[in-house]
Amino acid sequence: TTQGFAIYGRYAFSMHDKGQCVIIDLKRNRLVNTFILDGNTGHCNNASFGVERYSRKSQFPLFYVTECRGERACYVNDITTEGARLVQKIFYDGEEITGPCDWAVDAARKRIYLYCTIGSLRWLKWFPLPQLADSDDKGEVHLQAEDALGSIPAGDIAIPQGSHIYKDVIFLMMQNLVQQLSQPR
């Protein structure tokens, strides 16, 4: 099943468990390719495009994918329709987090959002979107609590899978809402 989903131009990128990426040409309504993202063995809950490109020759802007199980990292990829290369990992080093993390990018505002569990509450924190130049010698960025631009309790969001953020508005698909809308009236 699809965990994360992002669209850029005429292409849809459907992310599945353990890093499987399925690319669909929306204009021609056909499958383009499927492959495993470099290094991502997680659940791929969210997928987003940023604004920076790895190089002038890059087919797409950098592609951000949540790895929510193991490292709780955001994997940043230079992606094409033929494959992807891991170019950066983003971590939050706050010790207060007790559960999985999910990441989503607001490209319009150049921010990255982190859904996390602190104690028994879900929180949303946001940070300036790191650039590739911010990486250390291992290709990693480690965000700290003091780097946050803000944070709010996120309420009863059990699973932020499939989130999309655009200009400070978060779009979240909630299973109960989908079930309610699909019920005959």
Regions found by a protein language model. Give the residues of each.
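A short beta-strand motif characteristic of beta-propeller blades
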Residues: 1, 30-38, 85-94, 139-154
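Structural signature of eukaryotic scaffold interfaces centered on beta-propeller domains
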Residues: 1-8, 43-60, 95-113, 156-168
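Short beta-strand elements that form the blades of beta-propeller/WD-repeat-like
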Residues: 8-16, 56-68, 109-119, 168-175
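Beta-propeller domains
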Residues: 8-40, 180-182
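Structural motif
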Residues: 18-23, 70-78, 119-130, 178-185
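Short loop/turn segments that connect beta-strands within beta-propeller blades
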Residues: 26-29, 79-83, 129-133
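Blade-loop segments of beta-propeller domains
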Residues: 28-68
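Loop/turn-rich, solvent-exposed surfaces of beta-rich toroidal or solenoidal domains
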Residues: 153-184
